[in-house]
């Protein structure tokens, strides 16, 4: 290969390349593929600039041979091929004279006509892949990227190829010739396979001063200095016999490695006890909306105005009564609270001008429901540190609950399609990086699959409620503000629709710390009769408040309308995360992207289109007692989204612990499935760590039961 490079390339290029490699401590005689790659890249940069000039009128022209005295300036400044110091000097002087933003990495060329730096890439792989790597590495809008491949493909930022067809054809022809010359000498395969991704050079990082002293103090025992410890870590071979490694780490550790076989794992033990209950901050599948289409009333967009308008669409109100009391609460207070909301809404309507916000009267029932004056008085620690029997008051262990079928139904519902669209196409954010085309295409396909999904409705509902509650908590700290629970969507025909799910009344909210709690009472409409699954509604008092006429196949039927009322609480940090629930869209899009990337790398081309448009193919969605469930790509998108949304709606310490610990067991089981002969020590301890998170949380219990299905099928 070295001989080929010296024959094939201009001696000046070879010399510059040797100099550059030596600057980075690389030997052209040993790293021959790299030698060839750098020469090729340098030659492409030179060819890119050849014959391109700017005349006295600042027009760009091509001159192959002409009057040597013409006042022509080179269109491109060549930066590649200079030593680092010189290259940075050139870049800095260009930035100073033109005002262009200074790049983070040394680019290859500067274009005086377009006033931009250019990064040239020459790849033996797929142009898209290399383009993405370049874009990710330089992370700059301003630097233009132009990638050529040895197969004649090219890709450039915003499909703006800078040069005319003919100049680019010269470059492509030259690359093709190099490839053929290599192939005829049997060098091409090794050259093609040797391409590494873009590497970013790590800076040497010195620690000095206080940090250095802290580092020396915090070393593990038996190490005298940071250098000493670093040398040990660098020399630590991660593969090899684990027992030996453990004894090398510490004399006290001894671990017997047990082989992990198909018969080793047992199912997770799910807790016994009464069935678990609903604990989300708002109703999910059981929610009922009062809606207005094409809202155009006065004050449209002001929540209170929208809510009153929605309330007026319903005519079946009746005297409310309790149909499912709350076991521990003073139920008549919940009833009075609803009556108070109706009365105060009526009062608003009788006023001349409807106010933008409504603060409820501080009645006995609301004070009770919002826990006013219930919190023990806070005493400064200084005043009581001398009390002899000072202790934290006892709190009961949480009561164990068993898995109930309702949570699986909730999840199934969240994966379904509704007949409305809950996000616009651009909800997942505009393109920022220059990976425009593929990224937009994936985003648009994905959005089309999930925009009508019920989980997306939950996202928008969660964002709305948390935003409104956080705003009110800061703006009206002492007031019992009435907050309508609203969402907006578009119907199949594209008409706008505003929906009211019910109301929240916020308690006092002097939130100093992130974890300080604000209490609220939620009142939500529903057609679900709570007596069908009373265990699900343990935390609610449910009223019957009206009758609703529903259109069915057999004509109109009247169904009782219920109001689910409960006391609840949240904190600044929880509301902050609730406001950011749109991240779930991004998380599930990234999971889908990694599936597409895997497909694409097998097929060696971007598979986005085929992935979403091949309707006949099915994909694994999850495990159930019946086996591996499969479904269309849309179903996969919606299932991943629903999982992400439920992780947000049912976030809890139990979920954090379960996810972290069960993942370890999952990886071991997958290693066994891939015939990697995994070994474990203290498997009992791992089971204990997982099972201590299985207490009473419905979403965690459901995940644990899915995990058991996975274990059963994975290890058959």
Curated annotation (Swiss-Prot):
Main localization of the protein described in the UniProt heading: host cell
Role according to the record: Plays an essential role in viral RNA transcription and replication by forming the heterotrimeric polymerase complex together with PB1 and PB2 subunits. The complex transcribes viral mRNAs by using a unique mechanism called cap-snatching. It consists in the hijacking and cleavage of host capped pre-mRNAs. These short capped RNAs are then used as primers for viral mRNAs. The PB2 subunit is responsible for the binding of the 5' cap of cellular pre-mRNAs which are subsequently cleaved after 10-13 nucleotides by the PA subunit that carries the endonuclease activity.
Q: What is its EC number?
A: 3.1.-.-
What's a Pfam family in this record?
Flu_PA
Q: Where is this motif: Nuclear localization signal 1 (NLS1)?
A: 124-139
Which ranges belong to the motif Nuclear localization signal 2 (NLS2)?
184-247
UniProt KW Cell division keyword = no
User: What is one Gene Ontology biological process annotated in the Swiss-Prot or TrEMBL record?
Assistant: cap snatching
Subcellular location, in the record's words? Host cytoplasm; Host nucleus
Which residues take part in binding Mn(2+) 2? 80, 108
Gene3D superfamilies for the chain: Influenza RNA-dependent RNA polymerase subunit PA, endonuclease domain
Free-text remark on how the cofactor is bound: Binds 2 manganese ions per subunit.
Name listed for the protein in its UniProt record: Polymerase acidic protein
Mind telling me which GO cellular component terms the entry cites? host cell cytoplasm; host cell nucleus
HAMAP family reported in the protein's UniProt record: INFV_PA
- Alphabetized GO MF terms: endonuclease activity; metal ion binding; RNA binding
How this chain assembles, per its entry, is: Influenza RNA polymerase is composed of three subunits: PB1, PB2 and PA. Interacts (via C-terminus) with PB1 (via N-terminus).
Say if the entry is tagged with keyword Manganese.
yes
Q: Enumerate the InterPro entries for this protein.
A: INFV_PA (IPR037534), PA/PA-X (IPR001009), PA/PA-X_sf (IPR038372)
Tell me which family the UniProt entry assigns to this protein.
Answer: Belongs to the influenza viruses PA family.
Summarize where Mn(2+) 1 binds, as residue positions.
Answer: 41, 108, 119-120
